[in-house]
């Protein structure tokens, strides 16, 4: 075993986590209170080389994973209560992160497909990736609020009634995205942002029933 490479890997990992911790608050606050900035920031970073992108703020996907997927995974593991050893925890985290990422992907995927369908631009791999990044920034605050109340529900079922607030916030943030990306007026953007809720609304109701039902 090359201990030099091992220590270097540990050093790089510790440094990377420290950077994430430092950049997380300002990235989340910016995306929460300045949604137009997130779209502009992604467009500006898209002009750079891939290795030079998202140096000042967390990348959209990483922000989305930290504030949406990770808290939901933690709340699900805690709710199940089947962790009896460190190995159980590691296994639950591995499986939980994958499943929660797939569940959380439904929201940006629905909006991306809907936006591309309503737009006039040709669908390309590069444009889809940029759109995914924009939606990750736009949806992170709403999914963070949902994750927060999902965790608080573990202590008091009263907080479950705040879960629909995330859908309202989601629509608000998506209005900014539709207005900027499709160059449409507010009323039309609001309509476009609401329509996908016909798909996502039943999913939210199912999740609320999941949290209400006894384990």
Language model regions located:
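Short amphipathic alpha-helical segments, especially helix-boundary/capping motifs
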Residues: 9-18, 89-91, 150-154
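Hydrophobic alpha-helical transmembrane segments and adjacent short intramembrane/lumenal linkers
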Residues: 101, 107-212
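Short, non-transmembrane cytosolic segments of multipass membrane proteins
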Residues: 1-29
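Residue-level signal for functionally critical sites in structured catalytic/ligand-binding pockets
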Residues: 12, 16, 22, 43-47, ...
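Helix-coil boundary and interhelical linker segments in multi-pass alpha-helical membrane proteins
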Residues: 80-82, 154, 213-215
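Phosphate-binding glycine-rich loops and adjacent basic patches that engage nucleotide phosphates
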Residues: 1-4, 93-96, 137-139
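Selected alpha-helical membrane-embedding segments in polytopic membrane proteins
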Residues: 20-126
């Amino acid at each position: 075993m090359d201990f030099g490479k091992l220590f270097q890997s540990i050093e790089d990992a510790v440094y990377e986590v420290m950077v994430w911790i430092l950049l997380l608050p300002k990235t989340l606050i910016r995306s929460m209170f300045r949604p137009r900035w997130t779209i502009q920031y992604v467009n500006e970073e898209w002009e750079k080389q891939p290795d030079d992108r998202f140096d000042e703020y967390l990348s959209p996907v990483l922000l989305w994973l930290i504030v949406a997927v990770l808290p939901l995974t933690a709340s699900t593991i805690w709710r199940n209560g089947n962790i009896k050893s460190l190995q159980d925890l590691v296994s639950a985290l591995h499986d939980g992160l994958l499943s929660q990422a797939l569940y959380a992907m439904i929201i940006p995927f629905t909006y991306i497909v809907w936006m591309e369908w309503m737009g006039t631009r040709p669908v390309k791999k590069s444009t889809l990736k940029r759109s995914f990044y924009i939606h990750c920034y736009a949806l992170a605050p709403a999914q963070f609020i949902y994750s927060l109340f999902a965790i608080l529900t573990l202590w008091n079922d009263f907080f479950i009634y705040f879960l629909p607030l995330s859908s309202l916030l989601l629509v608000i943030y998506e209005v900014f995205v539709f207005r900027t990306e499709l160059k449409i007026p507010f009323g039309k953007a609001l309509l476009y942002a609401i329509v996908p809720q016909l798909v996502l609304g039943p999913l939210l109701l199912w999740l609320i029933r999941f949290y209400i039902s006894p384990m």
